[in-house]
Protein backbone atom coordinates (compact mmCIF):
# COMPACT_ATOMS: atom_id res chain seq x y z
CA UNK A 1 0.00 0.00 0.00
CA UNK A 2 1.10 3.56 -0.65
CA UNK A 3 2.30 5.30 2.48
CA UNK A 4 1.11 8.80 3.33
CA UNK A 5 1.71 11.47 5.93
CA UNK A 6 4.70 11.26 8.26
CA UNK A 7 5.50 7.70 7.19
CA UNK A 8 5.26 8.57 3.50
CA UNK A 9 7.40 11.72 3.47
CA UNK A 10 4.30 13.93 3.55
CA UNK A 11 2.58 12.25 0.62
CA UNK A 12 -1.17 12.71 0.26
CA UNK A 13 -3.55 9.87 -0.53
CA UNK A 14 -5.05 9.38 -4.00
CA UNK A 15 -8.80 9.87 -4.54
CA UNK A 16 -9.23 12.15 -1.50
CA UNK A 17 -8.72 9.30 0.94
CA UNK A 18 -7.82 10.03 4.54
CA UNK A 19 -4.31 9.37 5.76
CA UNK A 20 -4.51 7.32 8.93
CA UNK A 21 -2.25 7.51 11.98
CA UNK A 22 -0.04 4.68 10.74
CA UNK A 23 0.54 6.20 7.32
CA UNK A 24 -1.99 4.23 5.29
CA UNK A 25 -4.88 5.51 3.17
CA UNK A 26 -8.53 4.70 3.79
CA UNK A 27 -12.04 6.09 3.99
CA UNK A 28 -13.32 4.62 7.27
CA UNK A 29 -13.37 6.35 10.67
CA UNK A 30 -10.27 4.32 11.56
CA UNK A 31 -8.38 6.43 9.03
CA UNK A 32 -10.37 9.67 9.05
CA UNK A 33 -10.95 9.99 12.80
CA UNK A 34 -8.48 10.21 15.67
CA UNK A 35 -4.91 10.27 14.47
CA UNK A 36 -5.74 11.23 10.89
CA UNK A 37 -2.79 13.01 9.26
CA UNK A 38 -4.24 14.58 6.09
CA UNK A 39 -7.38 14.92 3.95
CA UNK A 40 -9.41 13.97 7.00
CA UNK A 41 -12.53 15.46 5.43
CA UNK A 42 -11.68 14.61 1.85
CA UNK A 43 -10.44 17.20 -0.65
CA UNK A 44 -12.33 20.29 0.46
Curated annotation (Swiss-Prot):
Disulfides per UniProt: 4-19, 13-25, 16-43, 18-32, 36-40
GO BP of this protein: defense response to fungus; killing of cells of another organism
Alphabetical keyword list: Antimicrobial, Chitin-binding, Disulfide bond, Fungicide, Plant defense
Taxonomy, superkingdom: Eukaryota
Record-annotated Chitin-binding type-1 domain positions: 1-42
InterPro entries noted in UniProt: Chitin-bd_1, Endochitinase-like_sf
Single Gene Ontology MF annotation: chitin binding
Post-translational modification: Contains 5 disulfide bonds.
Pfam families tied to this protein: Chitin_bind_1
Identification of the protein by name: Antimicrobial peptide 1b
